[in-house]
């Protein structure tokens, strides 16, 4: 008996995974959070602190002519109390005032003291010239036990004018001084307020006393006020020191009939300097340009949170203790599961999903997989483009803050010279402005950095897409599935922007036609395989039943049913 058995095999052809190249960016496991204009706590790969919080607890004076006044108060360098004898003339880049310093010996005060102090701090030192005043009919040697050298004395730069004898009349006198130099002169004089009317009569004679001072820009009359006051340094009297700035070729005239403390020499400022009030140690072995009462700030950061009264070339004081400046792209950490599973083609993901922590030599880069294996490489062109734009960001921020805040400084310095001091609440208000501006500037720069990083990523994506054209297809995750065999040299040409599209066009088109009609996602492959197996089994069963039916019909096979 001839029995023919036909066997059919159903072969389901599933296309193998194509070569693939993915675009990605650098990521770290733990980034740094910064604030932008639109969002707080944005995580970035890198960030730099812009607020300095540490300093050197010393006055760094290396390379500077430093004058440490010690017990001498700065204003005393003009009038000359005993504690200031060695500082009557000096040159300095840095003037240090100490808490123990005293401006006076005989009790009194300087009018518009703070404004005068500001002028002297920036003076660069003091040079002096005799005013040439001579007197007759009076005494010029008044002394006091409050100003002691070897015995009773007086201010070295002033003359205490007294009646020729006790209770004698003081003559009306007029003295003038013309500034013949090219620089402005600082002129200081005093008005003596006796401890009582009796004391005033003893020193200057009876009658009302009047002192008049005038120049082309200044005119003022003074009347002494004798009276009982608490004793200081054994004295109940007071001396009020007044001052003016005398322009070149201008003349100052003094008219008086007693109670006048006459200047002996005019003072001239030598240049520019910086003055600070501090009690910390001076160190000639370190350098600095920014000083405050607690030491030296040597930071190159744009802001500081150490002291609002720092002087010199300083970071601007802000209330915030930290303002982080983004110097890297937005961070999207790579999930640990993907790091563990990577190695199969399907595990490679592009920039749309997550960053790559393995990309350590660049900000942007590629991953590929082909028959030769897997590889990762940075794209230096896009990385360098981003770095070039971000490098110097800190310096640009310093320029912005210095320009803006120095302008405010200059405006208020002028006001300070006019009114004698700067109101504390005004300084506090300006600190608020600085703090707000600093936070705004940093947020703007952070926004720009993140936008810039995204822009460079998009540029790289467009560069690859334009090269591959229809030779590949983007899968929606930042990866391109290539429709032709692409070895390592081929992958390198894509990265280097030298890929020849036409060279692979024909192969890519043929593979695309085969793949497109049955393009299946990996999630459905198991279902199709089981369906194919079931269909094959059903077909074989149908053939077997058909053969049995034909054999029975032709008599070649007999079927007997027993009950």
Swiss-Prot record:
Residues 19-529 are extracellular. The chain crosses the membrane at residues 530-550. InterPro entries: Capsid_hemagglutn (IPR008980), Hemagglutn_HA1_a/b_dom_sf (IPR013828), Hemagglutn_influenz_A (IPR000149), Hemagglutn_influenz_A/B (IPR001364). GO terms for cellular component: host cell plasma membrane; membrane; viral envelope; virion membrane. Palmitoylated. In natural infection, inactive HA is matured into HA1 and HA2 outside the cell by one or more trypsin-like, arginine-specific endoprotease secreted by the bronchial epithelial cells. One identified protease that may be involved in this process is secreted in lungs by club cells. One of its GO terms (molecular function) is host cell surface receptor binding. It is a single-pass type I membrane protein. GO terms for biological process: clathrin-dependent endocytosis of virus by host cell; fusion of virus membrane with host endosome membrane; fusion of virus membrane with host plasma membrane; viral budding from plasma membrane; virion attachment to host cell. Belongs to the influenza viruses hemagglutinin family. Major glycoprotein, comprises over 80% of the envelope proteins present in virus particle. This is Hemagglutinin. It comes from Influenza A virus (strain A/Fowl plague virus/Rostock/8/1934 H7N1). The gene is HA.
